[in-house]
Amino acid sequence: VLLIPAWIMKYYILDLSPHNSLVRYLVGQGHTVYCISWRDPGADDRDLGMDDYIEQGVMAALDAVGRDRPETRIHATGYCLGGTLLSIAAAAMGRDGDDRLASVSLLAAQADFTEAGELSLFINDSQLALLEDMMWKAGVLKAEQMAGTFQLLKSNDLIWSRMLRDYMMGERSEPNDLMAWN
């Protein structure tokens, strides 16, 4: 099984702890598990596009799994943007007659971008111009900037409930696997 995680949460979202791990579950079911670990981009990567991430990420990982297990068709699972990349790669593979994939599973993956939903609250021409300017100067959109937008999309869960509990009520939240990594 090849796991293709998101760029932001990385591989560990699928392997948080022994009792909260897709990797451990799959290994326990007898599968050999491979997982892409995306490196953090820098300013030198500013010109990389989706094609590059598909070719140097998804396709390179499929090649590596194929070299390790040449007689086995690959079950691939993509999470979030990793699933979007996997969808594009699988479509191209189908077009090209590349039959290395046994199955494709998508977890929280975006495939239809015609309606941005709540994200459209944060997207307008001036906001896009500001983001493009910041990305051009830094070479990338920084994780903190993306995380802030995601927090605003789920502000009751990710911002206000914690603030109310921690600061106003004086109750400390129990540690959880995700927050240990984040």
Task: Give residue ranges: language-model regions.
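Short, glycine-/Ser/Thr-/acidic-enriched flexible segments
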Residues: 6-9, 38-41, 60, 81-82, ...
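Alpha/beta-hydrolase-fold enzymes
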Residues: 67, 71, 85, 89-182
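Gly/Ala-rich beta-loop-alpha elbow adjacent to hydrolase catalytic centers
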Residues: 78-82, 86
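Short, surface-exposed "cap/lid" segments of acyl-processing enzymes
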Residues: 1-42
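Alpha-helix capping and helix-loop boundary segments enriched in small/acidic/polar residues
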Residues: 13-17, 45-53, 76-77
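Extended hydrophobic secondary-structure segments that form protein cores and membrane-embedded regions
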Residues: 2, 76-77, 104-109
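Alpha/beta-hydrolase active-site loop
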Residues: 45-68
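Short coil/turn segments at beta-strand junctions that form active-site/ligand-binding loops
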Residues: 31, 71-74
